[in-house]
Amino acid sequence: MKSITFHPKALAFIRSQSPTIKREIGEALRDVQKGISLGLPLSRPMPTVASGVHELRVRSATTVVRVFYFVKVADTIVVFHGFQKKTQKTPAQEIAVGQQRLQEVLHGHD
């Protein structure tokens, strides 16, 4: 089973969510750890962030949450950005923050 590494801000974001959202994120990441390939509607590739990045898509009755994760690191899943989605298209600002945080995690800076 793959290990998971979190950017500190992504972990704080996930911890701030409702119990329902946290449970769904946790269950989906556990499946990814086991090597299960998630597909739509739960996850989709996000090549606009970087090659190998996927967007976990979680919804409750009142909230839509997205979490970016990267799986092309040997035996590790990198969870590096999360945000509440309020528009149909992923905002450019969220993509830019995701790109920056991925580099921070991959190169050992927080």
Model-based region annotation:
Residues 70:
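Conserved Hanks-type protein kinase catalytic core
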